[in-house]
Curated annotation (Swiss-Prot):
Family recorded in the similarity comment: Belongs to the alpha/beta-type SASP family.
InterPro entries tied to this protein: SASP_alpha/beta-type, SASP_alpha/beta-type_CS, SASP_DNA-binding, SASP_sf_alpha/beta
Name under which the protein is recorded: Protein SspM
Organism ancestry: Bacteria, Bacillati, Actinomycetota, Actinomycetes, Mycobacteriales
Any GO BP: DNA topological change
Alphabetical keyword list: DNA-binding
GO molecular function terms listed in the Swiss-Prot or TrEMBL record: double-stranded DNA binding
Covalent S-S links between cysteines: none
Gene3D superfamilies the record matches: Small, acid-soluble spore protein, alpha/beta type-like (6.10.10.80)
Length: 51
């Protein structure tokens, strides 16, 4: 039997690889949302925060 792990089991801890990049990613999300006319506010939680 082959000894392997599938992709879902390899990185199941959901740790941020580059925690300092989170602010830049959030800024990018706001910029893209504004280009599409979407207003992001405190009620729009990310999927990471919601689990």
């Amino acid at each position: 039997m082959a000894n392997y792990q599938n992709a879902s089991n390899r990185n199941s801890s959901n740790k941020l690889v580059a925690p300092g990049a989170q602010a830049a990613i959030d800024q990018m999300k706001f910029e893209i949302a504004s280009e599409f006319g979407v207003n992001l506010g405190p009620d729009n939680s990310s999927s990471r925060r919601l689990g």
